[in-house]
Amino acid sequence: MEENESQKCEPCLPYSADRRQMQEQGKGNLHVTSPEDAECRRTKERLSNGNSRGSVSKSSRNIPRRHTLGGPRSSKEILGMQTSEMDRKREAFLEHLKQKYPHHASAIMGHQERLRDQTRSPKLSHSPQPPSLGDPVEHLSETSADSLEAMSEGDAPTPFSRGSRTRASLPVVRSTNQTKERSLGVLYLQYGDETKQLRMPNEITSADTIRALFVSAFPQQLTMKMLESPSVAIYIKDESRNVYYELNDVRNIQDRSLLKVYNKDPAHAFNHTPKTMNGDMRMQRELVYARGDGPGAPRPGSTAHPPHAIPNSPPSTPVPHSMPPSPSRIPYGGTRSMVVPGNATIPRDRISSLPVSRPISPSPSAILERRDVKPDEDMSGKNIAMYRNEGFYADPYLYHEGRMSIASSHGGHPLDVPDHIIAYHRTAIRSASAYCNPSMQAEMHMEQSLYRQKSRKYPDSHLPTLGSKTPPASPHRVSDLRMIDMHAHYNAHGPPHTMQPDRASPSRQAFKKEPGTLVYIEKPRSAAGLSSLVDLGPPLMEKQVFAYSTATIPKDRETRERMQAMEKQIASLTGLVQSALFKGPITSYSKDASSEKMMKTTANRNHTDSAGTPHVSGGKMLSALESTVPPSQPPPVGTSAIHMSLLEMRRSVAELRLQLQQMRQLQLQNQELLRAMMKKAELEISGKVMETMKRLEDPVQRQRVLVEQERQKYLHEEEKIVKKLCELEDFVEDLKKDSTAASRLVTLKDVEDGAFLLRQVGEAVATLKGEFPTLQNKMRAILRIEVEAVRFLKEEPHKLDSLLKRVRSMTDVLTMLRRHVTDGLLKGTDAAQAAQYMAMEKATAAEVLKSQEEAAHTSGQPFHSTGAPGDAKSEVVPLSGMMVRHAQSSPVVIQPSQHSVALLNPAQNLPHVASSPAVPQEATSTLQMSQAPQSPQIPMNGSAMQSLFIEEIHSVSAKNRAVSIEKAEKKWEEKRQNLDHYNGKEFEKLLEEAQANIMKSIPNLEMPPATGPLPRGDAPVDKVELSEDSPNSEQDLEKLGGKSPPPPPPPPRRSYLPGSGLTTTRSGDVVYTGRKENITAKASSEDAGPSPQTRATKYPAEEPASAWTPSPPPVTTSSSKDEEEEEEEGDKIMAELQAFQKCSFMDVNSNSHAEPSRADSHVKDTRSGATVPPKEKKNLEFFHEDVRKSDVEYENGPQMEFQKVTTGAVRPSDPPKWERGMENSISDASRTSEYKTEIIMKENSISNMSLLRDSRNYSQETVPKASFGFSGISPLEDEINKGSKISGLQYSIPDTENQTLNYGKTKEMEKQNTDKCHVSSHTRLTESSVHDFKTEDQEVITTDFGQVVLRPKEARHANVNPNEDGESSSSSPTEENAATDNIAFMITETTVQVLSSGEVHDIVSQKGEDIQTVNIDARKEMTPRQEGTDNEDPVVCLDKKPVIIIFDEPMDIRSAYKRLSTIFEECDEELERMMMEEKIEEEEEEENGDSVVQNNNTSQMSHKKVAPGNLRTGQQVETKSQPHSLATETRNPGGQEMNRTELNKFSHVDSPNSECKGEDATDDQFESPKKKFKFKFPKKQLAALTQAIRTGTKTGKKTLQVVVYEEEEEDGTLKQHKEAKRFEIARSQPEDTPENTVRRQEQPSIESTSPISRTDEIRKNTYRTLDSLEQTIKQLENTISEMSPKALVDTSCSSNRDSVASSSHIAQEASPRPLLVPDEGPTALEPPTSIPSASRKGSSGAPQTSRMPVPMSAKNRPGTLDKPGKQSKLQDPRQYRQANGSAKKSGGDFKPTSPSLPASKIPALSPSSGKSSSLPSSSGDSSNLPNPPATKPSIASNPLSPQTGPPAHSASLIPSVSNGSLKFQSLTHTGKGHHLSFSPQSQNGRAPPPLSFSSSPPSPASSVSLNQGAKGTRTIHTPSLTSYKAQNGSSSKATPSTAKETS
């Protein structure tokens, strides 16, 4: 009843119509405030008169009864809000109801009137709500009619049916109010927290009846529309089970049933107000009124309170919002019946929410008032009907004033509601205005201003309302109620309450007194809602209204009737308002109406002062007064008996309906279950079918099936023939017997028959025999796979054993060579080494070319296309020698390739990309075979290759299987076409071919050992000499004129731009990055012209330069094709890479593809920065801008560029970034800059090992700056910017492709870096600068020319070609050695190929644009290394272009591999450092990485294939560069001394690297070059490259397959891959011994110059980084914990530490980890450490990476999580040992360096190494410091160890993980901790950012890290791998373990 009454009050406007119908009884009561109200009243009066509760005026009802919904009433106005169609529907429905239920005609008519009134009145008063209400009203008409009837029966049925929304609210008002009076029972309607008690309608015919009941009960909160929406459900409570279930059958509704409206939409769950405001308010009011009419009387309290609840509800009206406000509803149930007390209490309490909801709609407050009145009346003991009428009418009357109050209350509520339904604020306001337009509008205006306050207040009131509602237990005490309501409802509600008390004056005339109280209460509400003033105002007004109307509306029937009429009007208005609200247009009208109302109200009452609520009330009151003549109330509770019986019937019906609903529910559930089962079955069946289809579609399977069918057919035929033959034999036998038997005669006919049969059988047999060969061939084709598999299983173990032996031998040789190189680094054996290496490479290249051709032919294109992705992997394996390297660091690169295998493959062979996979594989196998002979030269590569080869074999076998399947299919086709062609022999041939193919891919490894051993012996010596010469001569040359042999190789490299698989080694040897790279390396080594095939191949490779070494065209047969294809591929790849660029730069560390794309992008960006994505462009921007400038300048005048760099021209352009970092924090900046520079330099170093050397020197110098720059992200950015710019310059240099230029440029860069470093550490910088400048200037001279062009790909090619020619050794004197023995690596996505300078030249010339070349010179390596600070490591994106890494110094293939590995790994490590340092700066780092990648790309480009070739060329280039770098660093004054020592140690690394151009040299050089310039590959690619390089190091193969495991990359792996790539690249940088040495010099210089400041800075940075590192470490730990490869890395690291042979194996393990690292950024960090280690180890570890990147990584990762650093370190040290025979020497040296480095530096390392565990790293580093000496030997044994010389660099590196400088710094700090440097690189790549970046945050730690560099390097290394993410996450752990392991 309360609900009803409340609703009546609320809907009073809408209800006015009903009320007016009820006003039939008292038409005079309806004083419509607004014309609409009047009209509604009149209409309703008409209807009332006609239908006065009876079906008197159905015609009247014909008057758009829809108005309730906003139809006729202001339907025109409301039509704006609601569709006329709705009105029509409602009207038709009501008419139908009237006809169907004549006895309810009056009620229905009243409903129609209400609808019409609402349509108009809402327009006038509540346009917002009418629509909403209208919709509900529609249903209300049905349901509400019934409900209302039932309610009206109980509660003044008449008012209910008409006045209180009973009017068609309950559509099924079958009985008149009399029937309603004889309500079948009571229904408790709950909405939100409101519960209202309503008389049960005599009939509940449909769900619409229930909805109408709800709408009438909660007019403000609910509308038919809302209730009909699918998101709203009506639940009925099963008392027996105490559960709610959806009401499906209205017959389930029985007396005392508790119905609940549940809004499934959470947004509306507690936002009743919004919708209430929209139309719920009106609906609720109408419902309330209807209920008030019907149930109201029976439950006066309920009715009275329901209005209150409804007013509250209105705020909660929106079903969603209404839910909370629902309390009014809740009260309805318990409180409603207790309306007076209970409602006051419960409703009030809940009603606080109700008021809230009410506030949503002004009317609700009126209803609330009514509610209060009703409860009062109830309290007074008035009849429910009377109460309801009184409540509704009296309230309406009093509340017409009150109504205005209500309107204001609604207005206020809307304001209150806003709180719940801010969104509905306007709607609520509209509805409020619709309800009480005048006051509402005034209130709305006020409240809109106060709206939110009120809304808040409302919520306050809502909550308070709940509380306050309860307080006024007696609705009679309106003040209490009002206090509560006002509180809850806010001013509007308060006024309504106030009015209600007045209105309730019949029941609560005393309430007039209370209005004051109410006002006070309202004040509390106001206070609650901030609308206290408004509330007070409205309450006061309402008080006035109440005072005025209280007398009028006391218990007088007339007043009550009038109030009911008013309520009807209000209900109609509410409906109209809701309709208007729902149909926007009428809203304005409603507002106008509201304005009118307000005006009227103002005129009528002086309530305008309040929020206008009083006005509305006044207006309504006036209306009520006008219609004061109380419409004869329909039989109030006269029909109570009937009502009860009806209620009981209804209850029984409800029960039945409940049961039916339950049954329906069960049925539906069953249906759903069946559906689900069917779906499941369907899915299963479809899955099975799909599987079957796939199986059938499988070519092998298809062939099998076909063959089997043929075989069965054949057997069937054979069977028949046999049967016939048997029969014939029997027949002949019989004839024979007969012939012998005299008794029988054998006739001639019998004989002829026999002969005929025999002829048939014979023909059949002949046919069968003819068919058999075909069948045989087919079956053999099918079985070939099995045969191959069996053969593989048989032969693989032996192959692996041989590979391991080779790896071990290579490890020994490389160790020896490393010592040799270290000792003879400055001797000048470069030329001899280079010559030998070149010769070796030529041989290898030739073999590779042959193999590639063979493989290409044998493999078959189909297989290629089929196995393209796989090819990348398997190719890595086949190209074990070189590809292993590729696999090791190319895992990262390859990943991009795998993203776009075509990219990598194009470099190798276009078929590779598209269908070349098989060719590259076979080519790889061929290359492997050809490289196998070389393998001896590269023992470690062989060893690594072995491990890698395992993987290779697996991949190859898979490939071969695919290939063989493809071939089998093809052959089958051929056989089918030419059955005769295939005889047993041919089939045997086919099998043999297949076997050969398999063997090519698999046996190649064994072959290399056989062939390889010979080169090994020579190569090591030569390599050593070369390394020494190359480093010395190159460095010297660089110093002298920068025209050391290394510069010339760069030109060849240039020739072999990334597109070509060729990379020029430092020596100038062009290493085919892919197989072709190896071939190219040979050719290049021979000279650009030595092997036309190679050149052709190179060129083809070059063409797809963008496809990193995906398909080295060098395959002779497919050279042209490959060339073209590669060019196409290169273009495609370029496009792809350009696309990738965007993500690439972002994914510098994460995605190999990103890296390649970066490299490619860089190449492209170098040419056109526009191509680079914004982010890339940022990096590239400075990078590219500078690079472009550099390119232009380089192209125009490389020297100019160098001068720029040297003089600061670059600085002017770059300085903004470089100097920025420097200026920001000179020491930090220098470190950061160094770090970045190092990364960039590493990139550039990759592009130009010479440059890298310079870069390293530069980086060393810059490293301090970079480190310091890295102290802050800003410095890091500056550094990155610097790095980017410098990198850009270097990149330009790389682009120029003139190794010399690159070298010079790098040196210049280094000079700049050095200068900058000078700023941070003048001593070191000066030393580095002096050295750098010497080298740089000289190198610049040499490099300037060729390298000028190097910048752009094409320019690069042009320049590169010149320089590469020089690289060929003819190009430049410096590269003489390189020319003779210079090894270049062409690194593509799938392969690492050793190329000769000639090959490189050819490739570069062919694919100038598509190939990135990086010249790595021992001397230059140092410079690049310094420069690496600026141009840390070009991020190599093999995806885009093959990178040719040209080692300017002659070196063994294995040495080259080793150096290459160092290059790559450090880059990655640096990246990891970057990553670690800036978990925060991760993006920046990625940008850095992008720059780095770009630099790498550029460098790669400049180095011709440094990126793709990076893996290989990187090894070799670095191998060659490293000696040079070492030489350069050694030459560095001051720090140079250190560098020399370090270099000697490094030389140790470098020399062995250069000398052992093979594996060790490669590892060492890789390490050193790494530090010089690191190629940043995506982690996976890096891992793959590392693995491949390791394999190459072990096997010395010229072509290594880089298998990138991209699957891992997709998850965190991708990011980790990026990290791994960065990490490895970073590592590569530290591994650049020269650069490390330089960095060490720098660091020592810096340390000496500002060791304290730097240490502090490093420490700070470290600590800063450590925090982020801790997080990163945690993340990494999580990631790593998920990656089993960790253990592998650990094993790798440990093995690495344990023994050189193990080192290769461990390298493999580490490599896998790197692979995983590439796969998993965080986890990959640790693996990357391994990878860098593996890379350092060279190919030796590479095989592992390639072969078991995942497994090993998985293994390592688990343990490596904490041990990654350790193992990584160990691995690096071991690798170093492996690579460096003098690893211990280096270790020893490094030890001193490490000890010399303060513990603080170790912290830097610790952060660096502790990127995984930046903090533990610090402590670990402390322990590591001691350990560094102990570990350093092992570290020294690692390439890092040689790089211990540059531990200072390591520190720098750590700071400039980005640049790779950090590692150098770390190394520099470590001094002897080159491996540490390596580790920092690795860690700096990942972990170092905390440390490396320590330079910025962990700057102090960076120092420590540097100290730790020796021991911590590994730690850092692992953290790097682990640390990329482990930096922040698991790096911490990794570092501790690292420290432990280090110790």
Swiss-Prot record:
Composition-biased stretches (Basic and acidic residues): 38-47, 1155-1167, 1174-1192, 1305-1318, 1539-1548, 1612-1625, 1763-1775
Compositional bias ranges of the Polar residues kind: 48-62, 1368-1377, 1491-1501, 1512-1533, 1643-1653, 1691-1706, 1731-1747, 1834-1843, 1853-1869, 1906-1943
Glycosylation site positions: S357
Modified-residue entries (Phosphoserine), positions: 169, 361, 365, 474, 526, 809, 1027, 1030, 1033, 1044, 1461, 1739, 1841, 1896, 1899, 1902
InterPro entries reported for this sequence: AIP3-like_C (IPR022782), SRCIN1 (IPR051825)
Biased composition regions of type Pro residues, renumbered to the chain: 308-328, 1044-1053
Function: Required for normal development of intervertebral disks.
Protein name listed in UniProt: Sickle tail protein homolog
Protein's organism: Homo sapiens
Gene that specifies this protein: KIAA1217
